[in-house]
Amino acid sequence: MRIAFREHGEQARERADRSYAAFIRSTHRTMNPGVVYAFAAFAIWGLFPIYFKALHSIGAVEMLAHRMAWSMAFLLIVMTVRRQWKWLGPVLRDKRLLARFAASAVLLSANWGIYIWAVNDGRIVEASLGYFINPLVNVLFGMAFLHERLRPVQWLAVTIAAAGVAWLTWVNGAPPWISLALALTFGGYGLLRKTASLGALEGLTLETMLLCPVALLYLFFLNSHGGSGFEHASLSVKLLLAAAGPVTAVPLLLFAAGARRIPLSMLGLIQYITPSLQLLIGVVIYHEFFGHDQVIGYGAIWTALAIYSLEGVVRARAARV
């Protein structure tokens, strides 16, 4: 009897093991790695407030300069390992393209600087709103600069979002300047990069090359005048600052890998992981205020985003049929 039960139990375990192995194989077959890459990229960006909060002892401008410098160092290593320097010569001879990337570098540095300052000034919630608004700002920029025509549903989404921003302006007594500045600088950056001929990694490398001399001069000035926070920081803070290179480049590499493998409509939905995580971190971990008035304003913007995203998904599916 015991032998029979033992054999029956072993057979059941073998069947369970085979079923589990089949499940894993089917999951690997059905799961698009692009989804994993994109999810990881947006999740890392969503966790940025925790990273920058850990560097609160360093001033926002100095932190920005370190981010530029360490990003440049890390990207130089990545590009050298991958032997991807053939693009640089033609780009350096193209003055118009260089001017465009100089402009995008300025917008990128402004976006980084505003975000770093907002996080360390206790305005993570307001910063998250900027990235919720950003997709709708992209729609408006496409209409204004690329002569794209807005569909009725897109007009509805933009109108509802504008009503949400107007509500937050009224209850706070001033527009959400940080949110708007982040959305506009990142929207402008995206517009310039959309019309550029370089890939994501090459473009960021060129931008940091253009920004790095200014960053190094500023850091040298701080150090020579005794105002460097890095000089007096603990070892852990210095290591975190040095990690700004991979922290900046790795999610971008993941994003680029994901964007090549999944539809744009899916990428558009996954991108909301970033501001959602930032909002949760601001409210739950750092106890930033999020009252009824904020729920109404953000609710209007979330409704607009839901309308905008669903319309995009429906159109994408219809186009594939």
Identify the role of each PLM range.
Residues L55, M63, R67, A118-V119, ...:
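Hydrophobic/aromatic residues within transmembrane alpha-helices
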Residues L75, V153-T169, L182, D293-G312:
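Hydrophobic transmembrane alpha-helices of multi-pass small-molecule transport proteins
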Residues L129-I133, A200-L210, A249-V284:
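Helix-helix packing/entry segments at the starts of transmembrane helices
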Residues F39, A43-L47, Y51, A102-V119, ...:
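Hydrophobic alpha-helical transmembrane segments of multi-pass membrane transport proteins
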Residues Y20-E62, A163-T195, L217, V321:
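Glycine-/small-residue-enriched transmembrane alpha-helix faces in small-molecule transporters
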Residues I3-A40, A73-F101, P152, L204, ...:
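Membrane-interface interhelical linkers
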Residues W117, N134-Q154, S276-V295:
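C-terminal transmembrane-helix exit sites in multi-pass transporters
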Residues P175, Y272-V321:
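C-terminal-most transmembrane helix of multi-pass membrane proteins
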